[in-house]
């Protein structure tokens, strides 16, 4: 028979095991765009995941998106602290956050979900006049844009290197305008481009510049 002491030793670690980190999940859906649906999950510890569902894209890498993507991501301390501060200031999204009305054009259905030991909540919206929700939406969309650009650059590197120059210029502009963030998530590809003498020097230089500017935490 198992003694009470043995049972206690088995149960105690379960009672005192650390709670999983809080998470924010952002879902975007728009049938007119590629990818037509994606989900970003960010943990308060910086871990995360990106999953997208879209069309096949063209073989030369010119179309907007490749097929579905599912990959881990990392979110820097500065960005994730901003994200979780917004969640806590807005009741963990357990509130109405859509202010679209009939006069606001459809911009995609967005869902924010918070799950953590301190609370939980969900809100669905097309557009929100809440500036904090707006900034959070921009952050998630900018991370997704970085991953999408990385996917396009990968396809172009494999199938159509002549278009790398113009695509890197687009990414560089997006980064400077804040429309693409968390560049470290495509760092392996940028390192490949920076070190490949077979691609244009402008591509190499831009890749190095983006790597130098990306956060390291």
Residue ranges and their predicted role:
Residues 50-71, 170-172, 188-189:
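Acidic/histidine-rich, surface-exposed loop or edge segments in extracytoplasmic proteins
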Residues 74-82, 114-120:
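A short, structured loop/turn motif at beta-sheet edges
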Residues 19-32, 96-217:
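Short, well-ordered, aromatic-rich surface patches in folded extracellular/luminal domains
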Residues 8-15:
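Bacterial N-terminal signal peptides
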Residues 77-101:
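Charged, amphipathic alpha-helical segments
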């Amino acid at each position: 028979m198992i003694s009470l002491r043995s049972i206690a030793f088995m149960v105690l670690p379960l009672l005192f095991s650390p709670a999983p980190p809080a998470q924010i999940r952002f879902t975007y859906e728009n049938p007119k765009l590629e990818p037509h649906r994606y989900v970003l999950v960010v943990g308060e510890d910086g871990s995360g995941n990106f999953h997208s569902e879209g069309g096949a894209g063209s073989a030369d890498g010119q179309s907007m998106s490749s097929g579905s993507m599912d990959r881990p991501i990392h979110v820097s301390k500065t960005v994730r602290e901003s994200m979780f501060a917004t969640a806590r200031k807005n009741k963990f999204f357990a509130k109405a956050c859509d202010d679209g009305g009939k006069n606001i054009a459809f911009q995609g259905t967005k869902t924010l979900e918070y799950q953590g030991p301190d609370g939980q909540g969900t809100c669905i919206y097309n557009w929100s006049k809440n500036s904090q929700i707006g900034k959070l939406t921009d952050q998630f969309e900018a991370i997704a844009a970085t991953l999408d650009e990385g996917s396009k650059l990968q396809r172009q590197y494999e199938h159509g290197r002549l278009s790398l120059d113009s695509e890197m210029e687009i990414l560089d502009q997006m980064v400077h305008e804040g429309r693409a963030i968390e560049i470290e998530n495509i760092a392996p590809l940028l390192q490949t481009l920076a070190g490949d003498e077979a691609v244009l020097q402008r591509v190499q230089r831009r890749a190095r510049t983006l790597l130098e500017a990306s956060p390291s935490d």
